[in-house]
């Protein structure tokens, strides 16, 4: 789990600036409370292909994604959504890891509020 959290936060570049040791530790503490059965069961959701369902989404959608996401790289995930979903707005957070609500909260909140005002 240490490796996942390090990648989740891009700890190699953001530790001590946008990610505190306390934030990392809080995530660790939460992760170790998960049941082993639940951890194994969730893996199936990562491998399910939902692409055929995307054109059926008929509500406006906001997708926020960090361009430095090492868990789910932008080019392989969110950048593919425009054209597959009718009304999708993709906001790319520069320098953002997978954990953008923690590391780039101001930008995430601004994007959310702008989207809700539409």
Annotate the PLM regions.
Residues 1-56:
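Conserved alpha/beta-hydrolase catalytic His-Asp/Glu region
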Residues 34, 52, 72, 100-103:
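Residue-level signal for the nucleotide or nucleotide-sugar donor/cofactor binding architecture
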Residues 51-52, 79-80, 106:
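Active-site phosphate/pyrophosphate- and oxyanion-stabilizing loops and adjacent acidic/basic residues
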Residues 55-58, 83-85:
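Short, conserved loop/helix-junction motifs that constitute active-site signature segments
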Residues 57, 63-65, 69:
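Short beta-strand/loop motif that positions the catalytic acidic residue
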Residues 67-70, 95-97:
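Acidic beta-to-alpha connecting loop that harbors the catalytic carboxylate
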Residues 70-76:
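Conserved alpha/beta-hydrolase "acid-adjacent" motif
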Residues 86-118:
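Catalytic active-site module of serine/aspartate enzymes centered on a nucleophile-bearing elbow/loop
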């Amino acid at each position: 789990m240490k490796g996942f959290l390090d990648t989740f936060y891009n700890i190699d570049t953001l530790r001590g600036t946008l990610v505190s040791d306390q934030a990392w530790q809080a995530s660790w503490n939460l992760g170790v409370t998960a049941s082993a059965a639940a951890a194994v069961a969730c893996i199936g959701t990562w491998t399910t292909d939902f692409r055929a369902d995307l054109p059926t989404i008929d509500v406006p959608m906001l997708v926020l994604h960090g361009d430095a996401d090492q868990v789910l790289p932008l080019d392989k995930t969110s950048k593919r959504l425009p054209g597959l979903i009718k009304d999708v707005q993709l906001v790319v957070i520069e320098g953002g890891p997978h954990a953008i609500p923690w590391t780039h909260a101001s930008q995430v909140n601004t994007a959310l509020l702008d989207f809700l005002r539409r």
